[in-house]
Structures are given as structure tokens and as C-alpha cells.
């Protein structure tokens, strides 16, 4: 069958539409089967496990292409949820033969074995109904195969069996939380812990290197390079604390609220049982949501988590910028740090090496900040009993988690771990700074100290020479007071 004919059978539209739709398929199918939903029959590629509603969504939401597909963690979370739902539903009367087949099929989804059968994009209904039905249809057809039946026969029904006691309105917010909590625990927290540990190690390594401080990008009083890196380490530690503190709200699951939060079409105790099953399956402390109406109508937990990621991005932006500026040069910049040389930096300037890890990280931070805007707008658009920005909230949040996790790991491995101090340059800049004059304040007063600094700057002489010329100090007094190593903390 030609691509044109195949696509016509799928879309039923114009030649242009049909050809455009054909190009969106991951692979061109040459055979089809008939699937049905309440709208009637539709042709589905024979080699795909999805059914009628997924096929209609493919045709109705051709937005963004491959890069806009529903995030894989959401798909895997659907596998976890549907497996747990079947397990609990068997306690409430679901045929064990069907239930066990659903559990086996759902496990394959959770393991990522059926990812190619989840083609839908984020840009669909705001409740995520199409993706919920995608999961229901794939699991139903795979369960049918496990039972020795054919796809599309509906001996395992996507709604009656796989989606039993569920609504898209509670399943999608549930998988949002499962996916986010899982990714944060498995990816983000380990990456940030490693980055924090390495920054802390550098702080100790550099603890005795006294350097000039800078405020307003201008010279200030001294500190140690270790103190500077200690500030970075603490920022990351606080970021870890912030995101960890959001997890208790993510651990609350909406499942059991069904359509509007009342729990219609579920049995008493279903919500508690399924949360416990998910907790056991993921080894994370999931519980049923305290209030299902809040869990469906709002996504404040996701906004809160995204806010913590936004703060982490803010911290990492500052850290990466400081490090690349301190490493600027090699001859005409600040040059206090020597950054690892990972790759050639210019296609025209031979020998140039750039702070690429810092640049990559700062771009990631910008993206995370943008994602937080999307999550904030999405979270603010919960109308009455249902928020209908769920897919974009989930996508943006998971994108931020993955980006920060990966970028932090890359930054730690390819930059921070290999940073060295340029001791000679640091010492030179330290002893050229006019701000060492601050240590004279207690002895000669602010006004006299300012006069010393201005004279030294105007005449191009040293602070000591200026102080002696003004007659405010003896040489011995100056040498006793202006000791950078004694200016890095409170006096006794």
C-alpha cells in the first residue's frame, strides 16, 4: 500500500493533510485493523497497540511533532498506576485472569518496553484524557495478546477493565506526581548531592588562599577562595533542602477522586489501597491525597516544586557565572581560576578554550526559569473542579527536573571537579587592591582611610606610600594593620 493510500485511510482528509499526517508516523504501516469507539470505526496501524481514541488524537492534535511527545516518565508512571489499579480492582471483583494480564502488560509499560506505542504529544486536552486512553488502549490490547487473543477484540476493555474505578481527571494528576517524585529522587537529588560535595571539597582545598573580594563588580575586602566556594556549596545545599521539602505534597495522590473529587464509581477504601500499592511499587512514601477536590482542581504542589527548581536555577546561574568570570583570560581577564580545558573553543581563533560547561549550565537555568513561568500560568488556570493545563505543567516540570539533574552532573564532572586556583594571579590582584585600606579604619578613621585610597589611586602609588606621605601612619603601623590574612574574619 502506498504512503498516500495508507494516510488517506488513517485521516480521511485531503491529500495534503493525508501526506502531512503520513510523515508524522514513526514508521509507515502497510496494514491496518479496525478499532471502534463511541464515534464509530477507525483504521489503526496493525503493528501498533493503541486503539481508536489514540488514533483520533493523533489526527486531531498534529502539534509540534516528535519533540513534543508526552514525557517518558509520564508513560512509565501510567504503567505503574494501571498495574496498581488492576491489583486493587481484583480485590473489588475484577476477574483475576483479566487483572493479572493487565498487571503484566502494565509492567511492560512501566519498564519502557512499549514506549513506541505512546505517540501522543503534550498539546491535547488539558486533563490528559487522550494520554490516559492511550495507556488504557495499549495495556488492554497487550493484555489481550497475553491471553492469546487478538488486538482490538476488547476481551480486555480499555475503559471497563483497565480504567476501572478511574477517571482521566484523577489518573493524570496522579501520574504527574508519581513521575515528578520519581525523577526528583532518582535523578535530581543524587546530582545535586554530588555537586554539593564537590563544591564543599573545593572549599576545603582552597581554604588558605586569600584573595580579593568583589562587590558591585568592584574591588572589596579580602576573603579566602575557600570561603567563596563555601558560599556556592551552601547555595546548592539549600537548594537540595528546598526541593526535598516539596516532596510531601508530591507524595499525595489524587487517585480515587474520579471525575470531580467525590470518588464516584469507586469503592470505599480504593483510594487508600491504590496509594499504598503505588508506594510499594515505587518504594516511595505515596499516600492518598488529604483532599481530592484540591488534588484535581489545583496543582499547587507542582507549582511549589517548580518554584524550588527555579530557585536552584537562580543559584546555579550565579555560581556558573562567578566561576566563568573568575576563570576569564587566560591573560587579559581576572584569571583567578584555571578551568578544565575540555574542547577547542573557536573555529577561527586557534588555541582558544571557552568555559563551555558554565555556558551550558546558564542556558539550562534560563530554560528552567521559563518553564517555571509556564507551570505558574498553568497552575493558576484551575477552573472550578478541574485544572485543564495538566499536560503542560507535567511536561515543563519534568523538563526542568531532567535539565537541572543532567546539567548539574555535567558541570560537576567536567568543570568543578577540575578547577584549580591560579595562586600567583590571586596574590598579585590581592596586593594591588586599594580596598585593603579598610583595615585602617579602626586606627585612622574612615575619612583618613578614604584619603589614603584616593591618593594611591590618583598618583598610582601603593597604599603604604600614600599613608606615609599623608603622615597618618608610620611604616611599622601600616605593616601591622594591613595584613590580608588577618582580614578574613572578625578580630579578637
Swiss-Prot record:
Subunit structure: Homotetramer.
Any Gene Ontology CC annotation: cytosol
Transit peptide: first to last position: 1-28
Catalytic activity: (S)-malate = fumarate + H2O
Any GO BP annotation: fumarate metabolic process
Protein name: Fumarate hydratase 1, mitochondrial
Active site feature: 216 (proton donor/acceptor), 346
Location(s) in or outside the cell: Mitochondrion
Matching PROSITE patterns: FUMARATE_LYASES
Regulation: Fumarate hydratase activity (fumarate to L-malate) is strongly inhibited by phosphoenolpyruvate, citrate, oxaloacetate, ATP and ADP. Malate dehydratase activity (malate to fumarate) is activated by oxaloacetate, pyruvate, Asn and Gln. Malate dehydratase activity (malate to fumarate) is inhibited by citrate, succinate, ADP, ATP, glucose-6P and phosphoenolpyruvate.
Function: Catalyzes the reversible stereospecific interconversion of fumarate to L-malate. Catalyzes the hydration of fumarate to L-malate in the tricarboxylic acid (TCA) cycle to facilitate a transition step in the production of energy in the form of NADH.
Involved pathway(s): Carbohydrate metabolism; tricarboxylic acid cycle; (S)-malate from fumarate: step 1/1
Record family assignment: Belongs to the class-II fumarase/aspartase family. Fumarase subfamily.
Keyword Cell division: no
GO MF terms, alphabetically ordered: fumarate hydratase activity
Pfam family, one: Lyase_1
UniProt KW keywords: Lyase, Mitochondrion, Transit peptide, Tricarboxylic acid cycle
Site (Important for catalytic activity): 359
Positions bound to substrate: 127-129, 157-160, 167-169, 215, 347, 352-354
Superkingdom, natural source: Eukaryota
Enzyme Commission code: 4.2.1.2
Annotated gene: FUM1
Amino acid at each position: 500500500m502506498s504512503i498516500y493510500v495508507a494516510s488517506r485511510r488513517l485521516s480521511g482528509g485531503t491529500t495534503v493533510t493525508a501526506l502531512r499526517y503520513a510523515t508524522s508516523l514513526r514508521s509507515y504501516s502497510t496494514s491496518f485493523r479496525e478499532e471502534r469507539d463511541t464515534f464509530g470505526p477507525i483504521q489503526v496501524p496493525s503493528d501498533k497497540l493503541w486503539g481508536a481514541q489514540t488514533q483520533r488524537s493523533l489526527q486531531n492534535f498534529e502539534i509540534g511533532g516528535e519533540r513534543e511527545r508526552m514525557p517518558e516518565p509520564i508513560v512509565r508512571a501510567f504503567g505503574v498506576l494501571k498495574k496498581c489499579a488492576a491489583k486493587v480492582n481484583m480485590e473489588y471483583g475484577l476477574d483475576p485472569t483479566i487483572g493479572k494480564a493487565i498487571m503484566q502488560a502494565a509492567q511492560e509499560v512501566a519498564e519502557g518496553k512499549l514506549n513506541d506505542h505512546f505517540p501522543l504529544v503534550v498539546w491535547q486536552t488539558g486533563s490528559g484524557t487522550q494520554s490516559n486512553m492511550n495507556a488504557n488502549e495499549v495495556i488492554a490490547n497487550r493484555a489481550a495478546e497475553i491471553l492469546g487473543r487478538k488486538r482490538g477484540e476488547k476481551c480486555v476493555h480499555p475503559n471497563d477493565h483497565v480504567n476501572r474505578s478511574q477517571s482521566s481527571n484523577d489518573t493524570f494528576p496522579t501520574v504527574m506526581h508519581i513521575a515528578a517524585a520519581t525523577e526528583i529522587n532518582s535523578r535530581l537529588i543524587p546530582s545535586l548531592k554530588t555537586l554539593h560535595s564537590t563544591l564543599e571539597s573545593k572549599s576545603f582545598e582552597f581554604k588558605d588562599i586569600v584573595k580579593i573580594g568583589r562587590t558591585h563588580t568592584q574591588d572589596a575586602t579580602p576573603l579566602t577562595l575557600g570561603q567563596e566556594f563555601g558560599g556556592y556549596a551552601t547555595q546548592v545545599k539549600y537548594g537540595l533542602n528546598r526541593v526535598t521539602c516539596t516532596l510531601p505534597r508530591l507524595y499525595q495522590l489524587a487517585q480515587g477522586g474520579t471525575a470531580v473529587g467525590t470518588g464516584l464509581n469507586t469503592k470505599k477504601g480504593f483510594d487508600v489501597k491504590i496509594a499504598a500499592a503505588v508506594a510499594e511499587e515505587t518504594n516511595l512514601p505515596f499516600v492518598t491525597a488529604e483532599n481530592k477536590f484540591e488534588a484535581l482542581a489545583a496543582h499547587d504542589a507542582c507549582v511549589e516544586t517548580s518554584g524550588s527548581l527555579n530557585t536552584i536555577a537562580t543559584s546555579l546561574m550565579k555560581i556558573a557565572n562567578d566561576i566563568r568570570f573568575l576563570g576569564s583570560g587566560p591573560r587579559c581577564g581576572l584569571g583567578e581560576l584555571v578551568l578544565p580545558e575540555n574542547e577547542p573553543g573557536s573555529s577561527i581563533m586557534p588555541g582558544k578554550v571557552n568555559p563551555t560547561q558554565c555556558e551550558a549550565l546558564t542556558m539550562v537555568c534560563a530554560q528552567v526559569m521559563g518553564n517555571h513561568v509556564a507551570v505558574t500560568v498553568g497552575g493558576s488556570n484551575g477552573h472550578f473542579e478541574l485544572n485543564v493545563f495538566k499536560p503542560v505543567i507535567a511536561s515543563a516540570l519534568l523538563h526542568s527536573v531532567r535539565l537541572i539533574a543532567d546539567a548539574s552532573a555535567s558541570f560537576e564532572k567536567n568543570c568543578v571537579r577540575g578547577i584549580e586556583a591560579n595562586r600567583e594571579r590571586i596574590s598579585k590582584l590581592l596586593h594591588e587592591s586599594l580596598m585593603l585600606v579598610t583595615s585602617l579604619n579602626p586606627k585612622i578613621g574612615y575619612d583618613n582611610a578614604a584619603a589614603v585610597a584616593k591618593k594611591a589611586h590618583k598618583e598610582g602609588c601603593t597604599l603604604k606610600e600614600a599613608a606615609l606621605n599623608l603622615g597618618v601612619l608610620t611604616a611599622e603601623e601600616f605593616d601591622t594593620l594591613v595584613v590580608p590574612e588577618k582580614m578574613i574574619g572578625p578580630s579578637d
